[in-house]
């Protein structure tokens, strides 16, 4: 009914507009039209068909915040004296890290959609020709997920192997909470740990304070290291990736413990060039669509430039003999919708394109290049994978992810869309995707194997047993949230 009313209003608008504009002065028609427009807008705000304009989003956010305790109530109990996620080894086995520990780099590319990898434009031009070739050198996970659509939440999942909070960013909302992190474990094993942003403000989302509190030695924005010439290559949200990579490696060159092989380095590099303002790619750098006219074409230009600059990272790495023993992961912070389901902004919905990202692990001499196609993994699995690969087994940890090398059955994939009334999701057995909208209570269920485009919602006809199993999986999301809020994720022992 609401949809029909909206359609009728849209169809009648031209007639009303002509009638209103025909009047020489403000009259009853203009007042009536204005009142009807306001009333229709109010109906939309109160309906499931929420407008996604800035005013509508603001009003919805205020409304949701005012009833947050009821809307996001966590109906789950846990012994307040326990730390359910902490796992301890049965025996205090000695660590078995390699005598020559490798350097580790995670290149986290902004808004990196999986759909462009090994794909081409309609006229046959590849979006990511360089990355396509690099896939042959490492291990590619074909179905890899970001656990959220926010950069800070993706970084939390990557470094802490936990489900991101769905109420707020852990970096800001729980800034004083202590967790265990991948950087902390590596630091305890002799690594120098770094977090570099291409964005101008390392304090954005409280990144600096939070990561340094949780195991990162050095957290910096690349902007203070830019030359005047470099600053000419800032557009959109920040500096071009090529400049970011070059200045980062120059910074490493000045770190004597790393250059002298006294310490291996772990570094997460978060790019910013491919962030939202895809239409601001300089015209002379638009390789695929010089006269781009829509989001898809602007994104294509931006991601092609991103791919060109990724070559610079590997070229700079190869120039440095002191880094010849390096592991590199290339992935994204989250995906980005390109109108596959009518959405062109990542703060709106929950389809695959919002979460699916590329994942490539390159570790010469440590693994056989290939592909993993029979299982799905997520950012939460990165920390366990790296520790497994280099042979470090912490005596205690709270990681929920699993190593991609582990001989284990498919684990659930947890998804958090914190915007637009909050959508929470879980992918069971690698194929069954269940999503619940907290604001409305609406449920969505898809068989990703038989319906990869997510067109047929099976929730209304799903059997009770399936729903019960999926609802049970949601307990992990709610328990995760409860433990974060109650500071019961991690209890350090003996200073660790």
Regions found by a protein language model. Give the residues of each.
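N-terminal secretory/membrane-targeting segments
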Residues: 1-102, 119-128, 135-136, 176, ...
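Solvent-exposed soluble domains appended to multi-pass membrane proteins
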Residues: 87-496
